Amino acid sequence: MAGNKPFNKPQTDARDRDPQVAGIKVPPHSIEAEQSVLGGLMLDNERWDDVAERVVAEDFYTRPHRHIFTEMGRLQESGSPIDLITLAESLERQGQLDSVGGFAYLAELSKNTPSAANISAYADIVRERAVVRDMIAVAHEIADAGYDPQGRNSDELLDLAESRVFQIAENRANKDEGPKSIDQILDATVARIEQLFQQPHDGVTGVDTGYQDLNKKTAGLQRSDLIIVAARPSMGKTTFAMNLCENAAMLQDKPVLIFSLEMPGEQIMMRMLASLSRVDQTRIRTGQLDDEDWARISGTMGILLEKRNMYIDDSSGLTPTEVRSRARRIFREHGGLSLIMIDYLQLMRVPSLSDNRTLEIAEISRSLKALAKELQVPVVALSQLNRSLEQRADKRPVNSDLRESGSIEQDADLIMFIYRDEVYHENSDLKGIAEIIIGKQRNGPIGTVRLTFNGQWSRFDNYAGPQYDDE
């Protein structure tokens, strides 16, 4: 309690009076903490910002307290003081003074709160109880949906359940964010610089791509970045992304998580064995292997089993919520992840937005960026390109060629396109050469990096040919 004298309880809404509800279970709340927040604000208007960062009107359990807090917000926005007189007058104008307990209850709030010193702690209690009530409400909503699915199948019900629970978590996370003082940010920045200084001076500050020239351009795949890899069919975007995953799995301590929405896990593993063993993938796929092939594959399998540093989820039609929950689970189990890869973005779905593809892709893109930021892990997402580029003389992709490009281009920190001239020109002088075109890099240069493409091994390698213009 904020003071020694107990508060009189104001007029409450139906949920407070219903004897059936009272006889079963009362949702978690703290009337005392709510009263102390409201009373503290009348004592010290300067604490409004501290409280408003922690709670909103809907976080208060009783309707009178929600009305009082809302009216305090109006007074604050208008530049008026928040005290007993101004608050009572404002509530009277809204026709709500009697419903909140009248002038007498407001006077009690002010009188029985001796200090605003602990108002932030009281606000945290109010917020905490509100989150638990939200969880209870969502649990009831999920149960109701289970009893009355209204034509939805179990997958759709699971998506509803996960999305509603995630919404609570996301709202909570947003409340925990906000402006930080420059000394906090500076301390974290200096700590990061010191960490980088202690590392080998190879210019790689993120996850090593395994490609020297690409590392020079990007300094590696940076934590919290959303990285888009895009190409037209047959350019090798899945191969390139898998090579990034293989290199990360070999070089990093934490595991790599792959969501393969298009290709079964067995096919992914065949490609990986071909790449790491340098055995023709056609021979692996058909089983036409000689003793040397088997020896190479066995050696690769031994390394993979020893490191056990990769997870593959080949579920189709995943939602952002499903991707996020599965990534979180692996993250918790291993204390982190080195890389997340999704093949490919347009195969994900958001059932509630299925009627509007543009909004659906925007939500998928936004959620993947949020995942990268939350887990502090680079997220590599493959994307399709529009067919319209096939009509151009120069078929090298640009950012506007991304299918449903607006939101993807906006959310991405790094966009890489793959272009192989031999796909379009049989007699090209650039046979076996791939261009990795960096179309966007939020914190670095754009340009082109060349790699050698060894399709028979499902592999891109460092380019060792003549110098080239990388601008």
UniProtKB/Swiss-Prot annotation:
Residues 1-22 are annotated as: Disordered. The keyword Hydrolase applies. It catalyses: Couples ATP hydrolysis with the unwinding of duplex DNA at the replication fork by translocating in the 5'-3' direction. This creates two antiparallel DNA single strands (ssDNA). The leading ssDNA polymer is the template for DNA polymerase III holoenzyme which synthesizes a continuous strand; ATP + H2O = ADP + phosphate + H(+). GO terms for biological process: DNA replication; DNA replication, synthesis of primer. The keyword ATP-binding applies. One of its GO terms (cellular component) is cytosol. Its EC number is 5.6.2.3. One of its GO terms (molecular function) is DNA binding. Residues 200-467 form the SF4 helicase domain. InterPro entries: AAA+_ATPase (IPR003593), DNA_heli_DnaB-like_N_sf (IPR036185), DNA_helicase_DnaB (IPR007692), DNA_helicase_DnaB-like_C (IPR007694), DNA_helicase_DnaB-like_N (IPR007693), DNA_helicase_N/primase_C (IPR016136), P-loop_NTPase (IPR027417). Keywords: ATP-binding, DNA replication, DNA-binding, Helicase, Hydrolase, Isomerase, Nucleotide-binding, Primosome. ATP binds at residues 231-238. Belongs to the helicase family. DnaB subfamily. The main replicative DNA helicase, it participates in initiation and elongation during chromosome replication. Travels ahead of the DNA replisome, separating dsDNA into templates for DNA synthesis. A processive ATP-dependent 5'-3' DNA helicase it has DNA-dependent ATPase activity. Homohexamer. This is Replicative DNA helicase DnaB. It comes from Salmonella typhimurium (strain LT2 / SGSC1412 / ATCC 700720). The gene is dnaB.
